Amino acid sequence: INGPNLNLLGKRNPTVYGDVGFDEYLAANNFAGVELDYYQSNVEGEIINMLQSSDADAIILNAGGYAHTSVAIRDAVEAISVPVVEVHISNIAAREAFRHESLISPVAIGCIFGFGLKSYDLAIDYFVNHFKV
């Protein structure tokens, strides 16, 4: 599940987020045979609805800027039984001070950030190796 502005990957600030769009990233990888469903929304409530209605074995969540501001998304992650790994493309600890704290991190089972789109690969590897998804 990708949050706000991640629909602009490949176009938005490529020095921070890279020059590859998410659809291109998905098409270029087979993800070790793991079945993936992809969802992106710029709307907080839609992200919450997707978290609450998911029947997935695991969720990779990049809430974008909502990671730093949305108590509602944080509470949704805490409320569901599906394990969630929080990812960020950029190294949020090395960016502006307001990006240093994630409200989601304390309720996710883990956090991966700063490795570009490889952050998603690392989250998938974690779930495959630890949850046998």
Describe each model-derived feature in a short phrase.
Residues 58-93:
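Mid-chain, well-packed structural core segment of small domains
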